[in-house]
C-alpha cells in the first residue's frame, strides 16, 4: 500500500508569509482573521485580504484554514456571527476552533466551513476524538503533550489528526494556561499572551527562565510520523517573518518529498538551515517523541540562539580579529558573547570562507576580549535566498485548431481541469499566410501567468494553409483561456474540499439531561486528602469532590473506598490513553460509591461512565451556545469560566444549566509536563520511575516547592503523580476570594465552589465553615490574609 503523505501545514501571519508558504511548498496554510484569533499581535487578514489570500492559495491547490480559536464572551456572539459569515464568504476551507460555542455556531449557521479542533481543546485520546467527531469536527489538532502512541490511537478513530512538527512550544499543557491572564490581564485564551513563561524565575537555588521550552523540530523523525496515520504536519509561527516561513517550509517540503520517494536521510545541512533561521538553545523532539525535562527546557536563553560562528583572536581598538568556523557574509547579524554580557553587531565587509579571519568593527560599548564567542543570529545570504521565492509554475497543455471559416479554438488543461475558448472566425490570408510557428509564438507566451508549458510537445497546433491569424486575436484567445482556467481551477479545488454539512450533535454523545445536584445553595469543595472528607462535610460542604494527588489504578483502588458515599471524583485535565483506560476501570468498579465525576477537559465529556458529569473549569463553557453544547452532552452542571467579569457573566443568565462559581481558591495558572528539579539535575530519562519527591533529603519532598518571579511573587507548585510521571500545577500567588461579592453570585443563581490546594487541614475546615455561614446569609468578615478578586472586576483583554 503506498504511503499517504501528510499535508504540510504552514503559518501565514500576513500576505507576505502566505505567499512564502505557498511558493515554498506548503499544502495548506493557517492564518488569523481580524478578530477572534489566538495571535492578536499578528498582522492577520480582513475580509478583502482573506478573500485574495484564498484565491491565491486555491489557485496553487493549497488549503486555507482560519483560526477562530479564542474563547468568546457572552456579549460577543453577534460579532462572532458576523465574522464567521465574512470568513465563510471568502471560500476558506476550515475554521480552527477552541470554543464550544463557536463550534456550535459554525455547525448550525455556516456548514460550508469544515471544523478543526484547536490544540487548545486538549484532545489527547480516542474518546476525545470521538466526541469531537460528534460535535462536527473533521480534524483534531492534537494536544502537544500527546505521545506518538496516543496520536496513533486517535488516528485509528477515523478522524483526521494534525500534529506540530516545528516551532515554539507552550510550556503549559494545551488549553490550560492562565499565567499571562492572571499576571497582567493579557489572556492567552484571547490571543494576547505576554509570554510570562519566558521570564526569569527562582526555585531552590536555581535562577533563570525555568519554564521556557526549546523549539520543536521533528525533521529527522518524518518517516515515523508519516507512518503513524497522522494527516497533517503543522509548523508553528504566525508571528514569524516571511523569510522564516520560506526557509522552514522549503526544508520540510524537500524532506517530505524524500520520504515519499523512499530515499529520506537525515540531512545535517537542512537541520543547520533551521537552526540558523531560529532556535532557542537548540531543538527538542517534544513530548510526542518522548523528550523529557532537560531535553525540553532551555534554562539559559529565551531568544534566538543563532549558530556558533567563531572566536575572537585579538582586539585592537575597536577592531576584533575573528576566526570563523563557518562562512561569513556581508550583512550578517552577529552577537558577541561573554560571561553575563552580549553585544549585537552587524558585519560589513567581504565574504570570508570557513577557516578564515574577519575584521569585525565593534560598537563603542562592546567589551571584546580574546577567546570570546561570536554567534551568527542572521545569515544575510540565507535571508536573500528566502526572499527570492517565486510561485511554482503550474504545468499545462494546450491544443489549438485554426481552420478556415471556423472560429479559432484553444483548449488549455492542467491535467484535471480543462477549458476551451473560441475566438473570431479564421479568414483567408490576403498576403503572407500565418504558419504554425506564428501561432506557437503567441500561444506560448505564458510569462506573468501561473502556468507554464514545460515541454514543446504540450502545445499542439493545427493550422490550415492560406489563413491569416491576427496577433491580437491569438493573444486575446490565450488570455481568455488563462483567465478561465484560473477561475475554473480555483473553483474546482475549493468545492472538492467542502464538507457535506454538519450533522446535529451525534446521538452517540447526546445524552438526556440528568437531575442536577447543583443549585444556588450548593457548597462544593475540591480537596486532595481522603482523610479530610468527613470533616469538610461536617463544616458545611454539600458536595465533596476528591482530586487525587496520585492518579494511578493502585492509588484509586486504595483511596476511593475511603471517601464518604456520594463523594465526587475530579478527573485530571490530562491523561494518556493507557492511564485513562486503566483508571476508568477502577472508577467503574467503585461507581456505586461515587456521586459523579468532574470533567476537566472537553474530551472527558465523551467518557462512558455510569455517573453524572459536572463540567469543570477545564471545559470552558464561556457563552450561551457553549453552555448549551455542554448541556446537550449530558453535563448536570458547569463551573463558570474564571476570566470573565461579573457583568460579562450576566450574559449567561438565565443560566441554561446549573452552575458553580469558584469563590475561593488559587487558580491553576499552568500545568507542566516537565519538572524544574529534574531540569536542574540535568535529567532527561526516567520520568516514569522518578523518586525525587519521595527522597526526604529533597526540599520538594517536605513541602510543595514554589517559583518566585522577578517581582517577588511566589507561585506554589503542586504535583499529581501518574504512571508515566508527575504533572505539576503552577498555582496563583494569591488565592481568589469572592466572599465580598456574594451578592453577585446570588444574582447569577450559581452555587459556591471552594478549591483547596496548599491550605492546611485546619484552614480548609475553617474556610468551609466561613462560606457555609455566608451561604446561609450570615455576615462574613474579610479574609485575614492577602487575597485577590481575580478577574471578577477587572477582566481580560
State where each predicted segment sits.
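Surface-exposed amphipathic alpha-helical tracts and adjacent flexible/coil segments at the periphery
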Residues: 1-23, 28-39, 54, 60-88, ...
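Glycine-rich, highly charged phosphate/nucleotide-binding loops
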Residues: 45-50
